[in-house]
């Protein structure tokens, strides 16, 4: 399966908190933003682990144990372009975090999880700041869907959009 990523930490933050503006997060409510280092770094670590632990089958295992990335062409959809999206391919039925750990990359250098504590008010404030940075549904979904999502959020969050 393909896992969607973005090259922008602000877009990642938007996707992490975008649904929480309508919920009142109680104690212990968190959203998560995951950080992924350059895939060349991860793949080099995976290869060195294979050389160290299974040198006889290096060529065979290297083909199977590298994280593959897919960068879509701009012509596919404007949505992927505006989200700075790319995808990683992982084995079916396995989370990327588990797959990396199973292949010798279990430390915190490979995937960084940033836990963002939130309340309804803090998420609304965060979304207001992100929209001032031009990160909102209208720019992330450049079509009717984005305009409708923006309007629905703007009705409920005071000062969300400069037009309202």
Regions found by a protein language model. Give the residues of each.
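Catalytic-core elements of nucleic-acid end-processing and repair enzymes
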Residues: 1-164
């Amino acid at each position: 399966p393909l896992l969607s990523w973005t090259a922008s930490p602000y877009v990642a933050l938007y996707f992490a908190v975008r649904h929480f503006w309508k919920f009142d997060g109680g104690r212990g409510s968190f959203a998560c933003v995951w950080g992924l280092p350059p895939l060349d770094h991860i793949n080099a670590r995976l290869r060195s682990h294979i050389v160290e632990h299974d040198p006889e089958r290096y060529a065979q295992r290297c083909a199977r144990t590298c994280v593959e990335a897919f960068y879509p062409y701009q012509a596919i959809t404007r949505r992927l372009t505006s989200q700075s999206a790319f995808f990683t391919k992982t084995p079916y039925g396995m989370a990327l975090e588990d797959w990396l750990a199973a292949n010798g990359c279990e430390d915190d250098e490979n995937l960084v999880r940033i836990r963002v504590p939130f309340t309804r008010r803090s998420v609304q404030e965060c979304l207001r700041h992100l929209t001032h940075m031009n990160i909102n549904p209208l720019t992330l979904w450049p079509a009717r869907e984005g305009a409708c999502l923006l309007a629905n959020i703007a009705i409920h969050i005071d000062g969300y959009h400069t037009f309202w």
